[in-house]
Each structure stands twice: as structure tokens, then as C-alpha cells.
């Protein structure tokens, strides 16, 4: 073995998707400076999947469209190496860190894999239950209800003990799941120090329900928001995947006095609000952690049981440590799991400051464009 081969740095491919997933993977990679880290939008190598991708039918999914454009822009801005579909650098990777296990290509299944929970999973529908009974792939549930439940990855990093139990109950081996917390949702107190110019309002954070092939009565939702707000200022923050022109038009029609933000840091807006209204959005967990009164299409009491652990922002370091130990482990996956114990650090919101190596997704970090 040559000297160059002996000391060659190991390579890790981070699979990204939404803005939140992209920034989470960046934070984890930043904790692994001794490895060559590359990034790729989630992709398919199957001929049928590639054909569907070319038709444009996946434009509103994390495979393509605005999600991929934003991810590519983020990678370029932060000078991260983009190896989309392993087609640019063509490396043989030692490990893949996954943002989803709903779809994992065959070649990635042949190497070590670590799955990281992004945030909230979608509700389990009747069709989702039937798809599982029929033995269909998890993505056939047509939402993210089974993300983290395919049992495909070698290791799973969960946001909380509540989510760990959910993943286990839906199919993932208990010994694979580690409660690490998840970046962006592990230190809500950090968002209290912000430059958002408004305070004391009711914030409504929308979801991309219609854009992901589901139905929604948006006018009814807007009217509910107006009723909850009462005499207080109502602010809408639109989901980044929404049809913004349509959403803005609807809000102006049914809540003419509301302010509308299509961009900006949602977490900062939550930190300054009095009350938070959500649909199917993970940001509800920021409101819960900060003690806000929250509304959600999910049962709020159940959400409190699932809420991500608050560990002062060390989730990325904990996940990176797990990756480091696993990639360097020379035994089998089963041997690694037998020798590794789950370690979760949960501390008070105000006890510890977040690491300086924190990367929150925004095209204009800390900058808030005028409300529409």
C-alpha cells in the first residue's frame, strides 16, 4: 500500500433536500473537518425515476424545482462541494448521511449510512396505512409519515425520545435509533436575540399543502387566523415552496390588514410573536420550546411529547461524533450497535450558548425584506 493510499482522507456524501435539511447537513459536516465532505440533492438513478424527473412532475418535491435551486445556491454561497448524483467528482464514498430514507439509491445502500431527522413528519393517513399493509415502498404513502421508518439506514438520529418511539413503532429497529437532537431545533433560546423589527403580534406560518399534491381550504385557514388574532397585528410567513402570488392574493382578500413575509428568518419571527399558528410545520416546535401559545393541525399535547430536545445547540456535534465513530469502526454494523450506547444531553434553554459554527439557511441572513 502506497503512502498516499494509506493516509487518504475518507469521503462522506451528505444528501440534502429542503433549505432546513441543507443547513442541517452543513452544520454536521462543519464538525467533521478531518473528512472530505461533499453534498448532493436527493436523486434517483432508476430509469423510470429519471424519466419522471425530466417531465417536470417532481418540480414541487425535494428532487427538483425550487428546492434544488435553493440548495445549489446555498452550496455555492458557502463554497461547499456539490457532487450531484455522484456525477461531478465520481468519488467512491465511505459514508452517506441521509436526510430521508423514503428513497435511497442502490449504491448508497452499499456503504455506511446515517439518517438524520429533519423535523416533523406528516400525519399518517388511511392510504399510508394501506400502503404499509400492502408492502409498498415508504414513499408510496405520498407524504413523509414513514420518513425514518424504512429501516434502510444503518443508524438513525432522532430529535427526541418521542420520535424515537414513533420510528420504532413504524418499523425501524430499536437498536439503530439514537436520540441526538436535531440542528436548527435544539436551541430555541438563541432565536430570542434577533433584529426582526416587530413584536407582540400573532404569527401564522403556512405549509405547502397544495404544492405537495394535497387539498386545503386556504380561505378557511386565513379566516381562522384573523379570528385568533382579534385586535392584534396578524403576520403571515409563507412556506418557501408555496405559490407565493396565489398565497399573497388570498391573504389580501381574506385578511386585508395582515402583513405578509415571503422571505426572512421564520424562527426570529416566532421568537417575537405572542401566539403562533401553524398547519403541518416543524417550526411549531420553536414556539413550544419558547413557551408560546401554539396552534397546529396536529394535537398540540402530542407535539409537546415529540418536541426536539433542547441541548444548547450541540446536536450537530453529537451527530458528527456518531458518524466519526461509525466510519472509523472496522467491525460489522451489528458489532458497532452492540458497543455503542445512546447518549442524549438535555439542558435548560438558557444554560448554554449555541456553537459558533451554526449555519441557518437564508439567502439574506438576518435581513428582512419589507412585508407585502
Q: What are the functions of these language-model segments?
A:
Residues 35, 54-61, 109-116, 251-260, ...:
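Active-site regions of enzymes building and remodeling cell-envelope glycoconjugates
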Residues 54-55, 59-65, 229-263:
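Catalytic donor nucleotide-activated moiety binding site of glycosyltransferases and closely related
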Residues 24-25, 31, 183-250:
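Conserved catalytic-core segment of nucleotide-activated headgroup transferases in glycan assembly
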Residues 89-90, 104-110, 167-171, 196, ...:
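Short loop/helix-cap segments at secondary-structure boundaries that form the rim of catalytic
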Amino acid at each position: 500500500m502506497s503512502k498516499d493510499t494509506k493516509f487518504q482522507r475518507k469521503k462522506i456524501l451528505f444528501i440534502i433536500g429542503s433549505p432546513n435539511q441543507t443547513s442541517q447537513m452543513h452544520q454536521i459536516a462543519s464538525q467533521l473537518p478531518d473528512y472530505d465532505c461533499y453534498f448532493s440533492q436527493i436523486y434517483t438513478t432508476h430509469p423510470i425515476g429519471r424519466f419522471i424527473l425530466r417531465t417536470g412532475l417532481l418540480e414541487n418535491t425535494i428532487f427538483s424545482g425550487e428546492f434544488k435551486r435553493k440548495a445549489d445556491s446555498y452550496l455555492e454561497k458557502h463554497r461547499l462541494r456539490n457532487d450531484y448524483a455522484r456525477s461531478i467528482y465520481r468519488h467512491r464514498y465511505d459514508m452517506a448521511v441521509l436526510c430521508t430514507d423514503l428513497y435511497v439509491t442502490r449504491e448508497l445502500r452499499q456503504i455506511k449510512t446515517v439518517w438524520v431527522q429533519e423535523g416533523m413528519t406528516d400525519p399518517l393517513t388511511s392510504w399510508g396505512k394501506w400502503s404499509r399493509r400492502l408492502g409498498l415502498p415508504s414513499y408510496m404513502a405520498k407524504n413523509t409519515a414513514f420518513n425514518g421508518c424504512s429501516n434502510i439506514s444503518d443508524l438513525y438520529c432522532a430529535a427526541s425520545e418521542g420520535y424515537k418511539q414513533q420510528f420504532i413503532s413504524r418499523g425501524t429497529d430499536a437498536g439503530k435509533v439514537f436520540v441526538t437532537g436535531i440542528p436548527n431545533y435544539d436551541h430555541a433560546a438563541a432565536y430570542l436575540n434577533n433584529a426582526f423589527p416587530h413584536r407582540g403580534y400573532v404569527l401564522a406560518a403556512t405549509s405547502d399543502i397544495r404544492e405537495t399534491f394535497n387539498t386545503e381550504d386556504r380561505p378557511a385557514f386565513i379566516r381562522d387566523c384573523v379570528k385568533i388574532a382579534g385586535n392584534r397585528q396578524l403576520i403571515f410567513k409563507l412556506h418557501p415552496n408555496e405559490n407565493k402570488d396565489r398565497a399573497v392574493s388570498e391573504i389580501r382578500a381574506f385578511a386585508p390588514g395582515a402583513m405578509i413575509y415571503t422571505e426572512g428568518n421564520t424562527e426570529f419571527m416566532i421568537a417575537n410573536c405572542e401566539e403562533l399558528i401553524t398547519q403541518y410545520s416543524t417550526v411549531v416546535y420553536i414556539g413550544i420550546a419558547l413557551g408560546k401559545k401554539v396552534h397546529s393541525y396536529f394535537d398540540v399535547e402530542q407535539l409537546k411529547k415529540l418536541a426536539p430536545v433542547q441541548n444548547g445547540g450541540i446536536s450537530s456535534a453529537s451527530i458528527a461524533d456518531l458518524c466519526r465513530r461509525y466510519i472509523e469502526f472496522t467491525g460489522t454494523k451489528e458489532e458497532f450497535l452492540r458497543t455503542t450506547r445512546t447518549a442524549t444531553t438535555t439542558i435548560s434553554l438558557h444554560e448554554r450558548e449555541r456553537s459558533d459554527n451554526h449555519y441557518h439557511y437564508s439567502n439574506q441572513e438576518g435581513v428582512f425584506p419589507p412585508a407585502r
